């Protein structure tokens, strides 16, 4: 299986912040990677485009992927509302690791987070399935608009997204 690369055009209050590209580990975590890829392209009729990063904690992570409700309470995968943890072999080794947000075991949907640091306490609990390939500095810039309480000072949006 080919490891796809997707992109996010990120804006801050409607102003361009930059484009990040993300390599998906489809060779090891195909179901999770396919969910994220399809939500990036919109080929199933729903997508990440226009959704925001609703939770940003500096030094920890930037969380987004709720395209059904903009507040972090919505979740929808290409397989239905939720799908099982595929495997937990990849580790949260540092900044740029892409992982599924969840509410416990086997509750993956559309929400994801990008690590801003090594977060080993998430190993075995969240499916890490990709890594920011280019422009991790955009993720670092996004951190400046978050607070320790996870609120954001600016609206950080996925203005466009797709697959290379």
UniProtKB/Swiss-Prot annotation:
Residues 7-163 form the PPIase cyclophilin-type domain. InterPro entries: Cyclophilin-like_dom_sf, Cyclophilin-type_PPIase, Cyclophilin-type_PPIase_CS, Cyclophilin-type_PPIase_dom. It catalyses: [protein]-peptidylproline (omega=180) = [protein]-peptidylproline (omega=0). It is found in: Cytoplasm. Pfam families: Pro_isomerase. Its main location: cytoplasm. The keyword Isomerase applies. Belongs to the cyclophilin-type PPIase family. PPIase A subfamily. This is Peptidyl-prolyl cis-trans isomerase A-like 4E. The gene is PPIAL4E.
């Amino acid at each position: 299986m080919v490891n796809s690369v997707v992109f996010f055009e990120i804006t801050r209050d409607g102003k361009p912040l930059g484009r990040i590209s993300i390599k998906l580990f489809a060779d090891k975590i195909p179901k999770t990677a396919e969910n994220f890829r399809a939500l990036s392209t919109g080929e199933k009729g729903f997508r990440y485009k226009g959704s925001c990063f609703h939770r940003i904690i500096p030094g920890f992570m930037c969380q987004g992927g709720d395209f059904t409700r903009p507040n972090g309470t919505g979740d929808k995968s290409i397989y239905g509302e939720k799908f099982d943890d595929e495997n937990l072999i990849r580790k949260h080794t540092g900044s740029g690791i892409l992982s599924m947000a969840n509410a416990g075991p086997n509750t993956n949907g559309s929400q994801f987070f990008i690590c801003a640091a090594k977060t080993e306490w998430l190993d075995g609990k969240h499916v890490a399935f990709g890594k920011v390939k280019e422009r991790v500095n955009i993720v670092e810039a996004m951190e400046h608009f978050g607070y320790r309480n996870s609120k954001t000072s600016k609206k950080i949006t996925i203005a466009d997204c797709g697959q290379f």
